[in-house]
Amino acid sequence: MSITPARTRFAPSPTGHLHLGGARTALYAYLLARQTAGKFILRIEDTDVKRTVAGAEQEIMDGLRWLGLEYDEGPDIGGAFGPYRQTERRDIYAAHASRLVQSGHAYPCFCTPERLTQMREAQQARKEAPRYDGLCRKLTPEDSAKRIAAGERHVIRFKMPHEGSTIAHDHIRGDISVENKNFDDAVVLKSDGLPTYHLAAMVDDHEMQITHVLRSSEWLGTFPLHVNIVRAFGWDEPIWTHLSVFLKPSGKGKMSKREAAEAIKDGHSIFVKDLLELGFTPEGVNNWCGLMGWGVPEDDVMNLTEMIQRFSIDHLTPSPAAINFAKLDHFNGTHIRLLPTEDLVARIKPFFTRAGLVAEDAMLTQIVPLLRERMVTLDDALELAGFFFRESVSPNPSDLIAKGLDAPKSAEIARRVYQILVGQPDLSHAGAEPALRAYVEESGLNVNQVFGIVRVAVTGQKVSPPLFESMEIIGREKVLARLDAAAMALTKLS
C-alpha cells in the first residue's frame, strides 16, 4: 500500500446521466485517495456549453453521494484549489494559453470555419486524413500580434512537434510510443475564450495538485498530446492510468442507446440514476462495477471499507470488460442479505410509499426476515410483500383452482379452511399450521393443493413468503375475509 497521500479527481462533463463507466472511474479514484489518506476531488468539466444538460451536474453529485463516494473538494463544497467548475476558471486557462504562446509552444490561428472546411474537403478528396495544415503556424509573433490588436477572431493551437516520437507512460499499459507526425495542432483555447479539454484538464490537474489521473482508455488517442502539453509547461506528470472500456453483454462493442433501453425493460441499466430507482443498492453497484477491470476474483463480495483495504492500481487490467447483469443481480442480492434489518426496512419503505401503501416500520421489521433471502433488488419487497398492506387482494380466479382439482372442489376446500380457522382462537403460526395439516391428513388431499389454495387466497400470489408466518402478520380479520372472498370467487366458477 502506498504511504504517499494521493490527490485524485473525478472530472465528468454535465452532458448526460452519470453512467457505469463514470461511476467506476470515480470509485477507483475514491478508493485510491482513501487508501492513502489523500483527497478525492470532484471537478465539473462544463466547457462544452452547447451540450451541457440542465440538472446533470446535480445528478452527478447526487449519484456519487448515493454510491457513498464522498468527495473532499468540489463545486458545492469548495476547497483550497477552486473554483471546481471549468467555466468559472476562464481567466486561468487564458493565462496558461498565453504562457504557451510566449514560450513558442502554441500560436494564434486566424483560419475561418469556411477555410477549414475547404481544407478538409480537399484533403478528403486526396484521400488524406483531415488535419490542420499549419498555415498560421508560419506567422511571426509580430504578425499575429497585429491581427489580434485589430480584433481579428482567432483560436490558440498547441504546436505539436513534427519530428520524432512521443513516449508516454501509462501505469497499467507501460510505455506508449507514437510518432509525432500523426498528430494535429489541436485547438487548446477557443475563440470564445473557453478552453478545450486538452488544455483545461492538464492545467486543472496541475493547479489542483492531482497526483494520479484515472480516466477512460478512450483518451489514449490524445494521450501523447496531453503529455506534450504538460511537458511544454515544464510540469511533473501525474501517474496516468487509462481504464478498460465496458463492452455490451455479448462482449462485442459498446452498448448502444437502443440496447440500454432494452436493458431497462429487463430491470437493469448502465445509468446510476436508473439503478437507484430500480432498487439496486450502492453496495451492490460498487461491488459489481468495481470488479470489472480489477484483477481480483469476480465473485469477491466487498463493501467500500473492504475495497479500500484491498484496492491497488497495480492490479487494474487493460482488457475490456463485458457488462454482466447477472453478476449485478448476484452482488445486489448478496448485499441485501448482509444489511441489518433496521437498515433494510428503511431502504424498502419508499417503494411501498411510492405505490400508495402505508407500510409501518413495526410490520416491515416483522416481514423483512421472510423476504431477505428472496430479494434481488429492493423493489422486490413490494412485489413479494405488497399484500401485507392492502385491505384486500384480487387473485386471478383460475389461480385459486388447485392442481388436479376443479373449481367446485377448490371452493369446498376454501370454505372448509375458513371454517377451521374461524374456530382457532388466534391465527399464529403455532395454531394455524397444525390445524390445517390435520385437515390435509384426514381429507386425503395433497398438502400442496390445500396450502396452494390458501396461499393464493390470502396473498393473491402463487409465490409468497412463508405462508403461516405471513398469515400471522396479516392478522385474523383480513385472512378470514380473503378466504371468504376466494370461496365465493371459486363458487362463481363452478
Regions found by a protein language model. Name each.
Residues L20, L275-E283, P318-N324, V358-I367, ...:
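Structural motif
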Residues P83-T87, L189-K190, M208-W219, L247-N287, ...:
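Conserved phosphate-binding loops in nucleotide/dinucleotide-binding enzymes
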Residues T341-S443:
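Small-residue-rich helix-loop
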